[in-house]
Amino acid sequence: MVEIPAIDLRLAGGGGGAEETARLRDACARLGCFRVSGHGVPPGLQAEMKAAVRALFDLPDDAKRRNADIIPGSGYVPPGTANPLYEAFGLCDAAAPADVDAFCARLDAPPHVRETVKAYAERMHSLIVDVAGKVAASLGLHGASFQDWPCQFRMNRYNYTQDSVGSPGVQVHTDSGFLTVLQEDECVGGLEVLDPAAGEFVPVDPLPGSFVVNVGDVGQAWSNGRLHNVKHRVQCVAAVPRVSIAMFLLAPKDDTVSAPGELVDGEHPRRYREFKYDDYRRLRLSTGERAGEALARLAA
């Protein structure tokens, strides 16, 4: 069974880390999923954020529903027909402190929770921008900047019971954006990624202190097919609640997704037409093609 590659960010992407950079490039191209260490996010902040998220989910339902927005993927998402065990909180732009303040205010979150969420969102935004830059550098694009790309922040809880063991928590899907950085539940596994070579799902077991990175659909399109958008799912493996925290780097600020010219040549002709990310997200919703199939509709 394939192992999830582990990348030390202190080595990857720099001039002296050619071997680690090559491993990063291979992980993105082959599996579309890897772990990162050397990320600089303090263990104490990770623990504080996990406690804050659990406190938010333990709020009464009426308080949680006050944080419901009309923007898809933002606000409170209650359990539904497709994923009855799953609920989430979303922040549409985690890079904007005002959005974080508004999110906490609608929940009447206490000051220490607000400060934890703000500090964590800031560190995670820096981390995902750094990871994206190193991924781009592994493809030879050393000047690419992702600082102003919108980011979505999502807190997830899976309300597992004994009856749900063995059932799906979230169905098979790809992420629609460029990259996802995920802090897993340190006690409960369940995340599985598809190994395209073997056609089998591989468990991503918890590893405290590390983050899991997934390549999404925009990552595959922007890289002209060099990066692999990983299919993944969440399975219930234990009758206990499972909490995870995700940061999504979505698409360029102007919403336009197009492979840079440096990644298009005679041997690598352009694979996808230029498209708007919001249009693509709506395409996924309207077609129900949420596991990367919708990209084929944008073939050049």
Curated annotation (Swiss-Prot):
Residues covered by the Fe2OG dioxygenase domain: 149-252
Signal peptide range: none
Keyword Iron: yes
InterPro entries reported in the protein's UniProt record: DIOX_N, IPNS-like_FE2OG_OXY, IPNS-like_sf, Iron_ascorbate_oxido_reductase, Oxoglu/Fe-dep_dioxygenase_dom
One example GO MF annotation: metal ion binding
Pfam families for the chain: 2OG-FeII_Oxy (PF03171), DIOX_N (PF14226)
EC number of the protein: 1.14.11.-
Residues engaged in binding 2-oxoglutarate: 242
Effect of loss of the gene: Male sterility and production of parthenocarpic seeds. Increased levels of free IAA in anthers and ovaries.
One GO term (biological process): auxin catabolic process
Keywords carried by this UniProt record: Dioxygenase, Iron, Metal-binding, Oxidoreductase
Cofactor note (record): Binds 1 Fe(2+) ion per subunit.
Known function: 2-oxoglutarate-dependent dioxygenase essential for auxin catabolism and maintenance of auxin homeostasis in reproductive organs. Catalyzes the irreversible oxidation of indole-3-acetic acid (IAA) to the biologically inactive 2-oxoindole-3-acetic acid (OxIAA).
UniProt record similarity statement: Belongs to the iron/ascorbate-dependent oxidoreductase family.
Name assigned to this protein: 2-oxoglutarate-dependent dioxygenase DAO
